[in-house]
Curated annotation (Swiss-Prot):
Mg(2+) binds at residue 17. It is an enzyme of class 2 (transferase). Gene3D superfamilies: 3.30.300.10. It comes from Actinobacillus pleuropneumoniae serotype 5b (strain L20). NCBIfam families: metK. Residues 99-109 are annotated as: Flexible loop. Its EC number is 2.5.1.6. The gene is metK. One of its GO terms (molecular function) is methionine adenosyltransferase activity. This is S-adenosylmethionine synthase. GO terms for cellular component: cytoplasm. GO terms for biological process: one-carbon metabolic process; S-adenosylmethionine biosynthetic process. Pfam families: S-AdoMet_synt_C, S-AdoMet_synt_M, S-AdoMet_synt_N.
């Protein structure tokens, strides 16, 4: 049987695009704490010495945008000009306006159940039984490497680590089963003084080995640790960052399709975000129920219309029942209207800043990761 390779990447919380995502979602969380009915579309741009926060927000809440932005940057770890970005001295610009009343007219309804979608669009959700969190292994472990980098950096164990970092893992599959890790790429920003030898050794011992299962590593596994040999200039000084530019990192690492809509900075009335979470919830419950080994869901919506305009299921030949049966079970067990899915997943709560780094899926404490519908799906399928 032929060996197939598949690769996914992740980025750290200090990556410029992720700084922007976290600021946008921090603004959303602070608003939702005060005003659950707020309409928020918050975008952030970061570059050397500045953060620009803009977008369209309609709310009764008041948020100190400047202070909140500085706090997020500080929490990430950009606290000194030596890093090229300093939470205490960077400029913070506020360019927030109000959401168009034309959109409000299409979304708001006297009967909440008839709340229309905030925009048209397509959303995908995916699940696979190749990991215990029912996510693809490459993106799952790429995220875990980045979480470990932040943990080691913040503990001071490797005091030369800096916030910006990226990981990339290539997994080898045979007959759709993991047989090993073919390549590990990890690049991390670092202080000027550390040698390449010490950096490679530290990353291998403190970041890579504690995270990657040893049974997937072999003498044939290739390692690329800071392959350029130098990564001192990073963060917003190295590259500008924008909200919503890491949509594959945020989802399935390329293992499933993507509708194109980003998540961060958007309140749950935006189906780009909430329906993508619901699609993951549906797919995960189908796999958890044993109805398929892999499952991809597509949802679509029209602006101002409550019911989804389509539901598609693909199980890649792994389904225990037909795709048509699965679609019927979805209609019977999940309310995928905007208000219905918001209520079903309890989305009006300040949980979004945490989603903005290390992936939105495969982290069990988020409500869309529950598998509470699996039993009903099994029963409905007659299994």
């Amino acid at each position: 049987m032929a060996i197939n390779l598949f690769t996914s990447e992740s980025v750290s919380e200090g990556h410029p695009d992720k700084i922007a995502d976290q600021i946008s979602d921090a603004v959303l969380d602070e608003i939702l704490k005060q005003d659950p009915k707020a309409r928020v579309a918050c975008e952030t741009y970061v570059k050397t010495g500045m953060a620009l926060v803009g977008g369209e927000i309609t709310t009764s809440a008041w948020v100190d945008i400047e202070n909140l932005t500085r706090q997020v940057i500080c929490d990430i770890g950009y606290t000194h000009s030596d890093m090229g970005f300093d939470a205490h001295s960077c400029a913070v610009l506020n360019a927030i306006g109000k959401q168009s009343p034309d959109i409000n007219q299409g979304v708001d309804r006297a009967d909440p159940l008839e709340q229309g979608a905030g925009d048209q669009g397509i959303m995908f959700g995916y699940a696979t039984n190749e990991t215990d969190v029912l996510m693809p292994a490459p993106i799952t472990y790429a995220h875990r490497l980045m979480e470990q980098q932040a943990k080691v950096r913040k503990s001071g164990k490797l005091d030369w680590l800096r916030p910006d970092a990226k990981s990339q893992l290539t997994f080898a599959y045979e007959n759709n089963k993991i047989v090993g890790i073919d390549a590990v790429v990890l690049s991390t920003q670092h202080a000027e003084h550390v040698s390449q030898k010490d950096l490679v050794e530290g990353v291998m011992e403190e970041i890579i080995k504690p995270v990657l299962p040893s049974e997937w590593l072999s003498q044939n596994t290739k390692y690329f640790i800071n392959p350029t040999g130098r990564f001192v200039i990073g963060g917003p000084m190295g590259d500008c960052g924008l909200t919503g530019r890491k949509i594959i990192v945020d989802t399935y690492g390329g293992a499933a399709r993507h509708g194109g809509g980003a998540f961060s900075g958007k309140d749950p009335s935006k189906v780009d975000r909430s329906a993508a979470y619901a699609a993951r919830y549906v797919a995960k419950n189908i796999v958890a129920a044993g109805l398929a080994d892999r499952c991809e869901i597509q949802l679509s919506y029209a602006i101002g219309v409550a019911d989804p305009t389509s539901i598609m299921v693909e199980t890649f030949g792994t389904g225990r029942v037909s795709n048509e049966t699965l679609v019927k079970l979805i209609y019977q067990n999940f309310d995928l209207r905007p208000y219905g899915l918001i209520k079903m997943l309890d989305l009006i709560q300040p949980i979004y800043r945490e989603t903005a780094a290390y992936g939105h899926f495969g982290r069990e404490h988020f409500p869309w990761e529950q598998t509470d519908k699996a039993e009903a799906l099994r029963a409905g399928a007659g299994l």
